[in-house]
Amino acid sequence: MNDPLGDMLTRIRNAQLRGKSTVSTPASRLRAWVLDVLQAEGYIRGYEKKETENGQGELVISLKYFEGTPVIRELKRVSKPGRRVYMATKDLPSVRNGLGVSIISTPKGVMSDASARSANVGGEVLCTVF
């Protein structure tokens, strides 16, 4: 698999289109950090790490719905393995005029665009959520 984070985002998108309550994905630290931001911003209910027999583990993500419709309307990967996108603090994108969130990987950790602006750090724009 060339893009593990893109794979997780696609699994979330597909599960919500099918109306699933949970979705699982192989565990990694970056995926867990992105899920922490999604949970803090209110886009997912939560997640838990379960151990598998191969030792890698698995993240089971609880998806969130409002009146039967998915809370996440749009989930797009910005920085891809073939084309990384880095931005300074002043250049961080505003998603849907501030209604959405960009998830940024910074030297201070993975955080939302608002947190990165307040911490005055830039970094790699991983994805946008609306």
UniProtKB/Swiss-Prot annotation:
Gene: rpsH
Name of the protein: Small ribosomal subunit protein uS8
UniProt lineage: Bacteria, Pseudomonadati, Pseudomonadota, Alphaproteobacteria, Rhodobacterales
Domain of life (superkingdom): Bacteria
NCBIfam families reported for this sequence: PRK00136.1 (NF001109)
Quaternary assembly: Part of the 30S ribosomal subunit. Contacts proteins S5 and S12.
DNA repair as UniProt keyword: no
SUPFAM superfamilies given in the database record: Ribosomal protein S8
UniProt-listed Gene3D superfamilies: 3.30.1370.30, 3.30.1490.10
InterPro entries documented for this protein: Ribosomal_uS8, Ribosomal_uS8_CS, Ribosomal_uS8_sf
Membrane-spanning intervals of the chain: none
Alphabetical keyword list: Ribonucleoprotein, Ribosomal protein, RNA-binding, rRNA-binding
